[in-house]
Amino acid sequence: MVIYIDIDETICRSPDVPDYTVSYPITENIQKANALYDEGHTIVYWTARGAKTGIDWREHTEKQFKEWGVKYHELKLNKPYYDLFIDDKNMNTLNWDNNFIQEIGDDN
């Protein structure tokens, strides 16, 4: 299964957007995402970092991922900035439990 995961307020707190240098990890969510990686799922992080400012945050984000122990296959920085995302395959971290794979079916 290919799983796209947002970064800010999903696997880290970013209290001073757009200054991502002060972001800090949400360890519990990183562990959940890493478990999905370890189970063989393809993990792609997709972020809107720099979408409004034009700043390229790739190098800094990759450094943060290394420091935080984030496992992933790909990092995409071209996510558009939006206020609300409505989708048929969406999940909120408040309800994140790795049993969702069994609930929706695993095409891995």
Predicted regions mapped to residue ranges:
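Catalytic phosphate/metal-binding cores of nucleic-acid and nucleotide-processing enzymes, i.e., regions
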Residues: 1-108
